[in-house]
A protein has these predicted regions:
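A short alpha-helical cap/connector motif
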Residues: 18-21
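Generic structural marker for isolated residues within well-ordered, non-membrane alpha-helices
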Residues: 57
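Conserved PLP-enzyme active-site core in the AAT-like
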Residues: 4-9, 16, 26-27, 31-39, ...
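Aromatic- and Gly/Pro-rich donor/ligand-binding loops
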Residues: 42
């Protein structure tokens, strides 16, 4: 028992240090947006002037370094959030390109990989994917070649999900995004980060 704890002590210290940095990041976002007790009051009706909700979204945007955030209790799970993002950004005739291989099984019906009513495919959105290399890294030349004039949105899944591959790092994702932007600067890139912002420091 003690030997195992000693062996893992440096790893636990590393995790604790990362957790402190990320906790400070979230607290700084809350302080910047002056979160106080009034933001936790319930609201009724349509949510107009719901300062608590609006402020929570500002906190998320600041903590995750994004332009904006959509944080609602009506979004019930990760697949629901991804479906909302895909549906909002893709129109008939557009192409969705997944560059980290096949996404989660739950997205197959959303996209239309497996036939499903109201899928993106039914609305005229085409789908292609670029598989990862055998070592689990991005196939950058294949990604570069796959991006076309029709490609409207590029999907990256950070987590390995149920695949036997390593989780993608922020550095790897950044490199892939740079390749995509070099080919098509205006393409929308969506990263399913799966809480990855808390396992690294950004």
């Amino acid at each position: 028992g003690e030997n195992i704890l000693e062996t893992l002590a440096s790893r636990f210290a590393e995790i604790d240090a990362r957790a402190e940095i990320n906790q400070a990041k979230v607290l700084a976002a809350m302080q910047k947006n002056r979160v106080n007790a009034t933001h936790f009051a319930a609201s009724t009706g349509y949510g107009y002037d719901d300062e608590g909700r609006d402020n929570l979204e500002r906190v998320y945007a600041d903590a995750f370094h994004t332009e904006a955030a959509l944080v609602r209790p009506q979004i019930t799970c990760g697949t629901h959030a991804l479906a909302v993002a895909l549906s909002a950004n893709l129109l008939p005739g557009d192409e969705l390109l997944a560059i980290s291989g096949k996404p989660y099984d739950t997205l197959e019906e959303v996209i239309g990989i497996r036939p499903s009513p109201c899928s993106l495919a039914e609305y005229g959105v085409s789908y292609r994917q670029v598989d990862l290399l055998d070592d689990g890294s991005f196939d950058l030349p294949a990604i570069r070649a796959a991006i076309s004039a029709k490609t409207k949105l590029i999907h990256i899944q950070r987590s390995k999900g149920y695949q036997p591959r390593p989780t993608l790092s922020v550095a790897q994702i950044g490199e892939a995004i740079a390749v995509c932007r070099a080919v098509k600067p205006d393409v929308t890139i969506m990263v399913d980060n799966c809480y990855g912002e808390f396992v690294e420091t950004i």
